Amino acid sequence: MLVPCRECGFYLVSFISANRGGTANLIIRPRQKVIFVIFCRGLFYFPLCKRSANAETEEFMNITPNIEKVKSLAAEYKTVPLSAKIKCAASPLEVLQKLKAISSHCYMLESCEDREKWGRFTFLGFDPKAEITCKNGCVQITDEFGVRRFNSNPRKYVLQMLAEHKSPRLDDLPAFTGGLVGYFGYDYAKYAEPKLKLDAADDAHFKDMDLMLFDKVIAFDNLNDCVFLICNMQTADVENNYAAAVSEIEIMAEVIESGKAAKVEKPRLKSDFKPLFSPEQYCEMVEKTKHYIKEGDIFQAVISNRLEAKMSGSLFETYKVLRRLNPSPYMFYFSSNDIEIAGASPETLVKLENGTLYTYPLAGTRPRGKTAEEDTRLEAELLADEKELAEHNMLVDLGRNDLGKISRFGSVEVEKYHSILKFSHVMHIGSTVRGKIRHDKTALDAIDAVLPAGTLSGAPKIRAMEIINELENNRRGIYGGAIGYIDFTGNADTCIAIRIAYKKGGRVYVRSGAGIVADSVGEKENRECINKAGAVVSALKISGGG
């Protein structure tokens, strides 16, 4: 794609370089030979002429806040989000496909509040400023300075990144204006609980954590039919950084308007799905779990099974099908060099919004009815099931305890107790737990306190995780962890990593589990696992033409 400078007529041409997979930008005159080469982390370098990149943009884009407002914020904040609102004929999915042509690192976050009503904002990002990953205590940071590795708890470096980009909450902007986006795996819990030993077999080699720092955000406002283009500028050098951020916003608009879509290979399943455990093996794990319950070790544990198949192509088409088949409160697509994730999760892990914490335990499951009458019957049956109610109550108590670790004394409350939440393939019993976060705690503390959710581990949580580690003897990876964001303002919104397909190294995985209590029946719990995996497996088969 060519981006001409309106003032001097230079063009900027971008192509993938051999230098660590980066991008080479060639600045050329029209119909002239290449005269300069620059390597940078992103697709575009700032236009050569500030006049065309800044003044003309502000003239027809209305960039906010203005430079004087930014100067007033610079004393308190290291980062300020600049934004512009534009109209856009393309859909979020069409824009995402254009972003995939620019960067292998991209994401899309959206929400469906019920089966037909989509959430107000859809967030997209590309070309991260940095990436931080961790595996078995080895932290890796990749940014403009190269690759650095440390043997450490990743918490220190995550907090440092967020502190370096502390940003104000500005009126009239979407909830997310920039921050860390990605996943915390199930095994990330060992960094919050050092005494927890998770040493199960690791055949798929997923990272414990993969977060990318996005300082540019494209936010579709589905209510007002417009798009926010957001670029976070550093306040250390306001004059130059303001001009640079304005230039980035102009480039984002150009990409959305006239960028070319990536050619995305459809997924192709090259083998049948193979379960990690046969029905007989799963039932045996259920019986062993019940033995631990009878011995008084635990009240409940969530035992999972994993489906695995060989696959070529991308999960992008799978995501498009999944959002149609299984619209959910958390819909997400995430891509990096290491992994690709498509998911539709019904359940929040933890949300922090302006000082208030939320978690929403879901437990108790029935399939959706084929008719309205059958649906109503199954709903009544679920609410009358003492085993399901006991499981749910246990997890509500666990949610209260988790939030209590980081909430102000007396602020934790339970709302909407025993509500029925319906999704495309299943229904659940749900409740809301909320609290006010302590002044000395952060969004990362909230994730540390709650992950993994009781609905994916059990109660008491630590002992249940030890038993899961023993019985499954297979690292869960992303499944049961968290997917979402921590933003530069200190807020966070994360969902439980369930109802997901994740692809790595030519293989795709789908994992699901069931809560085991004293009177669980193995065959029934195995069927529950199959039901929970149904929407994702269907999306994979349909998107590949199967």
Task: Locate predicted features.
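Short, Lys/Arg-enriched N-terminal segments with co-localized hydrophobic residues
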Residues: L43-F60
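Intrinsically disordered, low-complexity segments enriched in serine/proline and basic residues
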Residues: R6, I16-S17, L26-R41
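Charged/polar low-complexity intrinsically disordered segments
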Residues: G22, Q32-K33, E56
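Residue-identity detector for glycine
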Residues: G9, G21-G22, G42, G481
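Extended alpha-helical targeting/anchoring segments
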Residues: M61-G546
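Serine residues within intrinsically disordered or low-complexity segments
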Residues: S14-S17, S52
